[in-house]
Amino acid sequence: MFEATTILAYKGENHSVIGGDGQVTFGNCVLKGNATKIRMLYNGKILSGFAGSTADAFTLFEMFERILENRKGDLVKSVIDFSKEWRKDKYLRRLEAMMIVMDRERLFILSGTGDVVEPEDGKIAAIGSGGNYALSAARALDKFADLPESELVRESLLIAGELCIYTNTNIKLLEL
């Protein structure tokens, strides 16, 4: 588990939303409270977020963007090619980062070992040290509350920020 952040993705009926907190931690010190760990890719058609080492995450973002361009925005083919490339490269296999990527139809977690996981329910995924808190909150809110997608993600991340010492409540969201 990476003691770095919380990223939550939710694919609702009307919108896909990804959100993350802004805390950057080094050991037991908070270095920054307003970092951006989520991005739009491929002309605003793909959402992504990372947890883990910032330098490693930027390496992965660049690699994924290149593959996404080569695959003309096909998310499924891109995550498969990305995983294959990640597993083949000895340097990449040592990177300490995870990513979530999504469009309006699909949602994937890309692990630090090159694994690709599509959530069982196909609509909620979380990574990072506060990921389990955010995931639990999102599942409960999805089941029992009638919130817009962006509010469900924001509230779930706020709960994670109250519980996880490596996550703050400076939440940023992106939506498709």
UniProtKB/Swiss-Prot annotation:
GO terms for biological process: proteolysis involved in protein catabolic process. Pfam families: Proteasome. CDD domains: protease_HslV. It is found in: Cytoplasm. The keyword Hydrolase applies. Keywords: Allosteric enzyme, Cytoplasm, Hydrolase, Metal-binding, Protease, Sodium, Threonine protease. InterPro entries: ATP-dep_Prtase_HsIV_su, Ntn_hydrolases_N, Proteasome_sua/b, Proteasome_suB-type. Allosterically activated by HslU binding. Its EC number is 3.4.25.2. Na(+) binds at residues 161, 164, 167. Protease subunit of a proteasome-like degradation complex believed to be a general protein degrading machinery. NCBIfam families: ATP_dep_HslV, PRK05456.1. A double ring-shaped homohexamer of HslV is capped on each side by a ring-shaped HslU homohexamer. The assembly of the HslU/HslV complex is dependent on binding of ATP. This is ATP-dependent protease subunit HslV. The gene is hslV.
